[in-house]
Amino acid sequence: MISKRRRLDSEDKENLTEDASKTMPLSKLAKKSHNSHEVEENGSVFVKLLKASGLTLKTGENQNQLGVDQVIFQRKLFQALRKHPAYPKVIEEFVNGLESYTEDSESLRNCLLSCERLQDEEASMGTFYSKSLIKLLLGIDILQPAIIKMLFEKVPQFLFESENRDGINMARLIINQLKWLDRIVDGKDLTAQMMQLISVAPVNLQHDFITSLPEILGDSQHANVGKELGELLVQNTSLTVPILDVFSSLRLDPNFLSKIRQLVMGKLSSVRLEDFPVIVKFLLHSVTDTTSLEVIAELRENLNVQQFILPSRIQASQSKLKSKGLASSSGNQENSDKDCIVLVFDVIKSAIRYEKTISEAWFKAIERIESAAEHKALDVVMLLIIYSTSTQTKKGVEKLLRNKIQSDCIQEQLLDSAFSTHYLVLKDICPSILLLAQTLFHSQDQRIILFGSLLYKYAFKFFDTYCQQEVVGALVTHVCSGTEAEVDTALDVLLELIVLNASAMRLNAAFVKGILDYLENMSPQQIRKIFCILSTLAFSQQPGTSNHIQDDMHLVIRKQLSSTVFKYKLIGIIGAVTMAGIMAEDRSVPSNSSQRSANVSSEQRTQVTSLLQLVHSCTEHSPWASSLYYDEFANLIQERKLAPKTLEWVGQTIFNDFQDAFVVDFCAAPEGDFPFPVKALYGLEEYSTQDGIVINLLPLFYQECAKDASRATSQESSQRSMSSLCLASHFRLLRLCVARQHDGNLDEIDGLLDCPLFLPDLEPGEKLESMSAKDRSLMCSLTFLTFNWFREVVNAFCQQTSPEMKGKVLSRLKDLVELQGILEKYLAVIPDYVPPFASVDLDTLDMMPRSSSAVAAKNRNKGKTGGKKQKADSNKASCSDTLLTEDTSECDMAPSGRSHVDKESTGKEGKTFVSLQNYRAFFRELDIEVFSILHSGLVTKFILDTEMHTEATEVVQLGPAELLFLLEDLSQKLENMLTAPFAKRICCFKNKGRQNIGFSHLHQRSVQDIVHCVVQLLTPMCNHLENIHNFFQCLGAEHLSADDKARATAQEQHTMACCYQKLLQVLHALFAWKGFTHQSKHRLLHSALEVLSNRLKQMEQDQPLEELVSQSFSYLQNFHHSVPSFQCGLYLLRLLMALLEKSAVPNQKKEKLASLAKQLLCRAWPHGEKEKNPTFNDHLHDVLYIYLEHTDNVLKAIEEITGVGVPELVSAPKDAASSTFPTLTRHTFVIFFRVMMAELEKTVKGLQAGTAADSQQVHEEKLLYWNMAVRDFSILLNLMKVFDSYPVLHVCLKYGRRFVEAFLKQCMPLLDFSFRKHREDVLSLLQTLQLNTRLLHHLCGHSKIRQDTRLTKHVPLLKKSLELLVCRVKAMLVLNNCREAFWLGTLKNRDLQGEEIISQDPSSSESNAEDSEDGVTSHVSRNRATEDGEDEASDEQKDQDSDESDDSSS
């Protein structure tokens, strides 16, 4: 066949005839089988030439037969036409014959369909593909134009015809002949005819014809057809999809594509969802490196597929469909929409995976969004998709997400929207999402950890069973990791998942059960959560299912309760009580039979009762364990998790036990030999000898001490006894039982509010010094027990509405304040004292007394730590602080080696002052409800007299001392709950509980609940704040008489000032809470701001947030006139800053904030607040930072301080201060200097260099600003000549280098294109900077002479920056053809005072290098490549050179 082709290429007509004769046998075979269907010649040139070339036409439905190879046929026909005697007229006759032949639709159809090839020919070719007759004829150049013309003439008659019975559309079949032609003779004409056909074709054929264009036209016609399609796109938007699909396959001009892209972008919001995949594909494929960011940003803005999902769901749920058919079509439409969205993101994922430019553009488009309002759910989806594409993108996405989360740009509602809308898209990348969540969990920022937990939550909610299993497994891994923040958050997520989908969680219960092996390292609150999770899974099982989890939990709890190791016993108590609560509230029983339901409920009550009895029997011999059991049981009742009938059984038992153990009649005289006279003290009622009750505290406590001492070496008695150490916790359980049973009414036990206690006179007076150590410890322990009793009494009765009870509660509050003073007196003289425990849990376990053997071993093996307390003297409170370790319980007689007080100070007279904050672990916790007492008014001593004690109907009001007592506790609670956990260092389990000691009850309340309670307290707190404000205003009033001023003692002023500060701290903690950024908390924020706004003027309801913030800011700023201390002023500033964070336009108030900060700096404060006070220095740093951060002109502010305040300080006496800035002294100068240098560097670093295209005015403004910055820098550097201490020099080295680097990056480009027009200004700027760099050079030499490594380690980097500056200045001068302005000179090294530094190495002077006068080692003459930088080793080597020289630019 190859030889035959070569012969055809070289021979003439005779050879053609010979070849035709060779094919005759095949033709004869064909005639024998198909003779009846063969078309007769009838003298037609068309038929004759076809037959001569090897093709036989057939009639009817029979295919035309091709007897030779297609290429041979085309060549034979071509040569037959060219060598025909009538050429070129024969072409016209041939085409006319074809036209006549195809007038019959069947014949035309045959010509458009592929030819039949004979078997022998197929075998020889090895292919089964055969072209149609028309396709073969189009491959002959001399026939192509005429045949194309004929085809386009025939197409219109088939445009509006439907498909044939065999599914063939003739119009499509005709156009298909034009596809993939080897050569197009007249492409321009073909393009014109195609476009003309498209313009008249029906819509369905228009789509097909348009999409066929790339397969029909050659590359030379792409520009023309693109232009015409662009015009058609404008005219007919229904053709957008096929036209854009074609554009992706055409070679078009980028500018043209840019116009089309803009046109499409404008219509993107109005297109149908099914068109999105093609449109997005076009947009992504048409981007270039330069336009990618712009295109992606615009696409992100306009691509909103969410509107196609949510409205359809809402509409489907709200509309009433009239028939099932409509409902079915609606469902199909929703499924179709989801499929289209998946296709859209498949296109995007494909582009991101294979086009790095697109991936980076998406990343940058999301990165540059700065506000939460501008972010969309699409941003979250795209970040997750980018994260899943490759390992190279993961770090970048993690960093960006962290920044967005920390700036509150991406919040929970956005993530929820992303998952609920695009869960089908995200489901495919579930492993990557879980990997990202795991990574975020390892952060130290609680907000980032929370975001990771949300990823787990939504993955579990929206994804399939396999992914749910992976989520639970990952969360269990976090729980067992040992990192407190991870553990807490993972447990919270598991609790949420149980609420979200309990049935799915039950399938994964086996994973969760493995956490039981890690209980030893958990905190009490974590243990509660674990048992809550497992109990919920265990007791929510459907009837008939396996209860293996219940069995495992019962085994674990019984094992821990029976343990002789106290830590495990505590775990068992917590777990048992938690499980009892879940069992009691479980209601998942079938309701088929009321009798069966009653039986099951009775069985549940029996289980709960037996479990509680087990706990009680295991704890009754240990005061520690009993106290924890009572507190845990009380929490269970407080959370309303106990069934009424169970509560009834418990309540009566508790009431009887308490009464028998602690309450005696008033007339019953205490029996025993006590070291002090026993009296009934702190009673609020006058009892006769016949009635009344008393708390039998001293006799019971003293009896316990004696018993402990007598059985120090014996086994613990099995006889049941109630310890006085359980008094407070037992009472808490009692009052919660009574309150629950009587709907909060405590009349049944109201006698405990005012009853006295059997005590000695606790006030030591002058006899304190003469007391023995044993007596001191005994008295101190009784004071602690009394103090904690009153705290629980206030907890119990604080919400009673009776005026009489309210008055008694306030009286108890006064008793608490009095007892605080007594405690401080005792603790000051008993340094090694350890108080009796107040509450027991694992957090405080390490701080409690141990047995003597345990303490001795601990002291031998472990150094003493400030946080851990050892066993104290048996004569102290620890005589009854018995701890069951192993199988013995004894009182340790050996004193601990260290005092509990970590922060103590000794006065000049040798008296030790103690802070009770260090003893927080030994105080009973105040409930959040106690602060409702703040609703009582504040009465100062100006008004307070004894009348209110004599008036029976007058409500006792709150005094300053009692107010301070409450505010201190509230402030600590809010700091612990509302302060962002990322601000607290996340520690390991060894110290995990320290910051939470004393807040165990608080942590069982939600943060939102705490915030809601505080918002309710805003009105009384504002009342107190205004009263204190008026108090200090009156003190400063000139018309106040001397007698009135004398009445306001220093102690009262101090107390009022402390109240002022605590109120501001509480308000700041509230409004700085990050939870307000969540959408669900906005209503709470509005409520809080409305309270403040209404204090200024009565506001209408539902005011916009911005107005509320503005009014609240105005209200609070009015208090700055009366702040009594610098610290109060700082908290006021912080509070105002917290309010500004809630504003959308904070800049309007920033200048006012700066003004307030400046007033604090310019005010003379009491002497004790400034001299060498570290706390004051920290506060001063913060206030100065706030001033410079919020002022509108930082450079001007720095110039004012350095130009006015510092000269006043320099000329003032040694201990004096600046008159303009009284806070600026010689001791605080370093703080001012450091903050000013840092803010100056930050300011210039933020300046934009600009471009040469900027206006001349912009260039002049930037030059002026840089002149001010360099002048400030010069003033600051020159101050180190006067104040040359290490901190000042260190700041100069550190921030001097940073300033030079900022000048290089931000200012030098500006000087490049400003030099020609502003030559003198630029040179003046450089000359000023040269003086500064020379000072820095001298500072480097001075540091080397002082041989202070803290300073010299900064020298190499500073010198490197200075050298780069010299070279950069020279490059700028060369660029502007001003080389003569740069010269090299030699300058000897000098110190800060200008004295020459004598070289220690005479030989080094012969080989020294030339330095710039900026103090930079420069080898410009040696063409040294300074742009590449130098390593520190070379810089340090240069530091050893004795002589250095200078380059200067002028």
From Swiss-Prot:
* Region of interest: Interaction with FANCE: 1-289
Q: Where is the composition biased (Basic and acidic residues)?
A: 8-21
Listed GO MF terms: DNA polymerase binding
Per the record, its GO cellular-component terms are:
condensed chromosome; cytosol; DNA repair complex; nuclear body; nucleolus; nucleus
Q: Which UniProt keywords are listed?
A: Cell cycle, Developmental protein, DNA damage, DNA repair, Isopeptide bond, Nucleus, Phosphoprotein, Ubl conjugation
Q: Which BP terms does GO give this entry?
A: brain morphogenesis; cellular response to oxidative stress; DNA damage response; DNA repair; gamete generation; homologous chromosome pairing at meiosis; neuronal stem cell population maintenance; regulation of CD40 signaling pathway
InterPro entries reported for this sequence: FANCD2
Q: How is it modified after translation?
A: Monoubiquitinated on Lys-559 during S phase and upon genotoxic stress by FANCL in complex with E2 ligases UBE2T or UBE2W. Deubiquitinated by USP1 as cells enter G2/M, or once DNA repair is completed. Monoubiquitination requires the joint intervention of the FANC core complex, including FANCA, FANCB, FANCC, FANCE, FANCF, FANCG, and FANCM, and proteins involved in cell cycle checkpoints and DNA repair, including RPA1, ATR, CHEK1 and BRCA1, and is mediated by FANCL/PHF9. Monoubiquitination prevents DNA release from the FANCI-FANCD2 complex.
Binding partners and assembly: Homodimer; cannot be ubiquitinated and does not bind DNA. Part of a FANCI-FANCD2 heterodimeric complex that binds and scans dsDNA for DNA damage. Interacts directly with FANCE and FANCI. Interacts with USP1 and MEN1. The ubiquitinated form specifically interacts with BRCA1 and BLM. Both the nonubiquitinated and the monoubiquitinated forms interact with BRCA2; this interaction is mediated by phosphorylated FANCG and the complex also includes XCCR3. The ubiquitinated form specifically interacts with MTMR15/FAN1 (via UBZ-type zinc finger), leading to recruit MTMR15/FAN1 to sites of DNA damage.
Free-text function comment from the UniProt entry: Required for maintenance of chromosomal stability. Promotes accurate and efficient pairing of homologs during meiosis. Involved in the repair of DNA double-strand breaks, both by homologous recombination and single-strand annealing. The FANCI-FANCD2 complex binds and scans double-stranded DNA (dsDNA) for DNA damage; this complex stalls at DNA junctions between double-stranded DNA and single-stranded DNA. May participate in S phase and G2 phase checkpoint activation upon DNA damage.
Name recorded for this polypeptide? Fanconi anemia group D2 protein homolog
Protein's organism:
Mus musculus
